[in-house]
């Protein structure tokens, strides 16, 4: 079964390593979202793949059977901020990697104006200057839920917090 301290990887690399269009698109995403490496894109793609796969499975079920599970999936994606409140499974199937990258803590910190650039946002997060509801989060890849979005700010122990108070 494997060592529980070493969990199974949650991503898979692309099937063919040298597709020019994909490489160009990945480089654009890395620059736009300040990602450290392409693995972060592949992790987002794997998460998205799982949600889309689940949506396709639900579409194959009869309507009366899938209703409960469909609501659960749509509620989960709504809470993550990926779809609107009255979304359908077609909206889940139309999600892109960009939609998921927009929900990363690093991106949300930059969009809120707490950082000067997307790279600065990554550094603030990894150095422990950003907190969600007063609790420090040091993972730039943390997917911010819809209800946590307004709770993001500087950590109370951060020098940025003291500057923001003045």
Swiss-Prot record:
Q: A biological process (GO) annotation for this entry? A: translation
Q: Name one GO molecular function term.
A: rRNA binding
Q: Which residues form the S4 RNA-binding domain?
A: 103-165
Which residue spans adopt a coiled-coil conformation according to this UniProt entry? none
Sorted alphabetically, the Gene Ontology cellular component annotations on this record are: small ribosomal subunit
Q: Which Pfam families match?
A: Ribosomal_S4, S4
CDD domains, per the entry: S4
Cross-referenced InterPro entries, in alphabetical order?
A: Ribosomal_uS4 (IPR022801), Ribosomal_uS4_arc (IPR022802), Ribosomal_uS4_CS (IPR018079), Ribosomal_uS4_euk/arc (IPR005710), Ribosomal_uS4_N (IPR001912), S4_RNA-bd (IPR002942), S4_RNA-bd_sf (IPR036986)
Keywords from the UniProt entry: Ribonucleoprotein, Ribosomal protein, RNA-binding, rRNA-binding
Q: Which domain of life is it from?
A: Archaea
**Function in brief:** One of the primary rRNA binding proteins, it binds directly to 16S rRNA where it nucleates assembly of the body of the 30S subunit.
**Subunit and interaction comment:** Part of the 30S ribosomal subunit. Contacts protein S5. The interaction surface between S4 and S5 is involved in control of translational fidelity.
Would you identify the family this protein belongs to, as annotated?
A: Belongs to the universal ribosomal protein uS4 family.
What is the name listed in the Swiss-Prot or TrEMBL entry for this protein?
Small ribosomal subunit protein uS4
- Protein encoded by which gene: rps4
